[in-house]
Structures are given as C-alpha cells and as structure tokens.
C-alpha cells in the first residue's frame, strides 16, 4: 500500500452543538476509532486505515475547527481549549453510536482525548493503540530540546504572530517532524483548513497552549494525571507503537508507559508524525492487534 496522497474513504458530516463536524465511517462491525491531534486531521490516517479493512467499522473524526469540521465563531484566545474540544468530540462519538467494543487508535492530542474518554468509558473499550502520545503530565525538561523555545513562544503573546499570521505549526512544525519530504499534494491537504490568516488558524495555537506542562493548564494536568494513573493499572489490552528516533514519547515519558500492563510494543521509523513515515508498519501492527482482540 505504502505512501499516497489520496484520502481514505468518504467524508461525512453531522451537526454537533450547532456546528458541522466531519468524519470518515467505512465498513461494518465493532469500531476502530482513529483520532488525530494538532495540526492534522483524519487525513493523517489515510495510508493506515486500509490495513484494517474488514476488521470493523473504521472511523476517523476531524476535531472542531480542524480538517473539514466547522470553525468556532466567535473565535479568540479563549476558544479551542481542551475542554471545548472534548465537549464536541464526546458529543460526536456519542452520535456515532460506537457501541461497547471500541478499539482506540490515538496520536498527539488524539491520545489525550482518547485516553481521557477511555478512562471515563472503560467498560466500552476493547483495546488502545497509541503512538507519540501524552502518557502523563510533562515538565519542560521532558520536552524535546530543539523545540522547547518555540513551544514556550507559542504559550506567550509571540504565538499570535507565529501561528495566526505565519502559520508556523503547519509550515514548520509539521514537516519538520516527518523524516521524509511531504509531496505538494500532501502539504496542500494539511494547509487547506488553515489557508486564511488569523482566527482560522486559532486551533493550531490553542493546542500548544493546552499541553499539560509544568502544572499548566491545571485542568489538563489533572486529566492527564488521572488517566495516567488509570492506564498504569488497567488490564485493557494496549499496543504501544514506539518511534525511532521519536519526539514526544521518549525518555521518562516512554519509560512510564512501558510499565503499563497487558501491552505489546513495536518500533517504527519516525519522529512525531510517524503515520507519514511508516504507515504500512503501523497499519499492519494495528491490524494484528485487532485480530488478536477479535478472533474470527
């Protein structure tokens, strides 16, 4: 299958809390739920989802303000908080009638949202596959040194110009954390939701300001602490897709999640957006994980 720019499946739309949200929903059976983070969309999973064809209902949602989902209006510095994203995604997942045998496949902010949802709906979770994830609250010392200054700038007033005007998260952070060069078609797909300067790009700025680092923001730190404690004891089957060299889930963060029970680990090539470097390896590992959970 390997690399390709063509999206997977057909975008569907549903009204959630007065806004139109976009998602992919292909196949039948118990769901395999793929959730992206910042600044991506369901497009991130296009070369991975085909590996799971025939294993269940393949769902990938675009977070509010991202991908083909509507922007929030009015917008501003107080919008697109973790809590607001969770409210919209919880409502969307509820509307999709996921049932009680859900396999979660999560990355980046999708991991925070997915781990949090799983802790709150543990009786409905069949398994969790995760990669480049926020496995616990962070300290700045955990954050990759080469990006520390930039992410601290995002959390200051300077972030407004860096992201809302210069589109740094899409133009610099995204391609900089992929080992291969993206094609023009691939970059165009990632740029498309954020072409207009200003508030259209607000989601990609609010997200780095919500990362649970050094005790801030307190609500997200508490959520990450709660799910970290739960995952470190939960018997729910887990697949940890480790990245080499990796970016976020390294060092202490990786050491911690490696202690989680009932877990399988594989390693693939990649920095942070590893779906763009190792889609076949990731897809094959997820498919094998699901087959173990759902023997024919």
Curated annotation (Swiss-Prot):
Residues 31-155 form the AB hydrolase-1 domain. It comes from the Bacteria. Belongs to the haloalkane dehalogenase family. Type 2 subfamily. It catalyses: 1-haloalkane + H2O = a halide anion + a primary alcohol + H(+); (3R,6R)-1,3,4,6-tetrachlorocyclohexa-1,4-diene + 2 H2O = 2,5-dichlorocyclohexa-2,5-dien-1,4-diol + 2 chloride + 2 H(+). It comes from Sphingobium indicum (strain DSM 16412 / CCM 7286 / MTCC 6364 / B90A). Its EC number is 3.8.1.5. GO terms for cellular component: periplasmic space. The active site is at residues 108, 132, 272. Catalyzes hydrolytic cleavage of carbon-halogen bonds in halogenated aliphatic compounds, leading to the formation of the corresponding primary alcohols, halide ions and protons. Is involved in the degradation of the important environmental pollutant gamma-hexachlorocyclohexane (gamma-HCH or lindane) as it also catalyzes conversion of 1,3,4,6-tetrachloro-1,4-cyclohexadiene (1,4-TCDN) to 2,5-dichloro-2,5-cyclohexadiene-1,4-diol (2,5-DDOL) via the intermediate 2,4,5-trichloro-2,5-cyclohexadiene-1-ol (2,4,5-DNOL). It holds the Pfam family Abhydrolase_1. It is found in: Periplasm. It is an enzyme of class 3 (hydrolase). SUPFAM superfamilies: alpha/beta-Hydrolases. Pathway: Xenobiotic degradation; gamma-hexachlorocyclohexane degradation. GO terms for molecular function: haloalkane dehalogenase activity. Keywords: Detoxification, Hydrolase, Periplasm. GO terms for biological process: response to toxic substance. This is Haloalkane dehalogenase. The gene is linB. Monomer. The keyword Iron does not apply.
């Amino acid at each position: 299958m390997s690399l390709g720019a063509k999206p997977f499946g057909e975008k569907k739309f549903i009204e959630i809390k007065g806004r139109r949200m976009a998602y992919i929903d292909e196949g039948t059976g118990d769901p395999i739920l793929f959730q992206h983070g910042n600044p991506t969309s369901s497009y991130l999973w296009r070369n991975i989802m085909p590996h799971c064809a025939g294993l269940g209902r393949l769902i990938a949602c675009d977070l509010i303000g991202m991908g083909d989902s509507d922007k929030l209006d009015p917008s501003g510095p107080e919008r697109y908080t973790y809590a607001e994203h969770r409210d919209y995604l919880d409502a969307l997942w509820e509307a999709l009638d996921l049932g009680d045998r859900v396999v979660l496949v999560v990355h980046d902010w999708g991991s925070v949202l997915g781990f949090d949802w799983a802790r709150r709906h543990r009786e409905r979770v069949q398994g969790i596959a995760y990669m480049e994830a926020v496995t616990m609250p962070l300290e700045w010392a955990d954050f990759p040194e080469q990006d520390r200054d930039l992410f601290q700038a995002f959390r200051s007033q300077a972030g407004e110009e860096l992201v809302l005007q210069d589109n740094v998260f899409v133009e610099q952070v995204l391609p900089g954390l992929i080992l291969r060069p993206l094609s023009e078609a691939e970059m165009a797909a990632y740029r498309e939701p954020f072409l207009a300067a200003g508030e259209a790009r607000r989601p990609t700025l609010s997200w780095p300001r919500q990362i649970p680092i050094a005790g801030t923001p307190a609500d997200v730190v508490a959520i990450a602490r709660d799910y970290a404690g739960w995952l470190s004891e939960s018997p729910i089957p887990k697949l940890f897709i480790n990245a080499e060299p990796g970016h976020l889930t390294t060092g202490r963060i990786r050491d911690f999640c490696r202690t989680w029970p009932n877990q399988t680990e594989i390693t693939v090539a990649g920095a942070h957006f590893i779906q763009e470097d190792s889609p076949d390896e990731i897809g094959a590992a997820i498919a094998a994980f699901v087959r173990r959970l759902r023997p024919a």
